Amino acid sequence: DVAPSRGLGDVYKRQDEYFEKVQDSNLMQNKEGGTYRPTFYCLRDNKTSLLWMVPLSSRVEKFKAIHDKQVAKYGKCLTIVLGEFDGKEAAFLLQNMFPIREYYLDHIHTRNNNPVPVKHSIHREVTTRMKKIRQLHSRGKKVVFPDIDRLEQIMLAEVKDNATE
């Protein structure tokens, strides 16, 4: 059900317009100190055509500590995947994932004008965990910080409005 958006491992920046539109204080801000951050790993939901954005963080030590605490307590950590992106360690923050329309994507993350892919093993892990998180969420478990039901409804309403225009 969840597949890469335009190819395996596409990573994007998000437009400020999305943040202004949805007004969710639990979404990660777009800019830190004037630079484009965070970057988002992008997966398409084939049922709705919406994209699910998973923020990447370079603050690996911070999220490794949270990850390790979850593993010690529960035997696993569903919401943070530790891995590599663009030659650097990164934390994929499923706890901060959210739905978006392709319209709100700003630009793809590139190196030397080529899209930077996410390793297939990380893609598999993120995809598997995202499915589990969405299943837990559908059963009423609060697993992610943003209000993904509200955000999904806003995006689906836009898709519907654009289809009738």
Give the positions of each predicted feature:
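Short beta-strand-centered aromatic/proline hotspots
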Residues: 39-43
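An N-terminal domain-cap segment
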Residues: 13-35
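A residue-level signal for beta-strand positions that form part of recognition/binding surfaces
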Residues: 9-10, 50, 91
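Compact nucleic-acid interaction/catalytic patches
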Residues: 32-36, 46-84
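Residues at the C-termini of beta-strands that transition into short coil/loop
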Residues: 15, 57, 101
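Residue-level detector of flexible, active-site-proximal loop/helix-junction positions
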Residues: 18-19, 60, 104
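Single conserved hydrophobic/aromatic residue that forms the stacking wall/gate
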Residues: 1-9
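C-terminal terminal-subdomain/extension
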Residues: 67-165
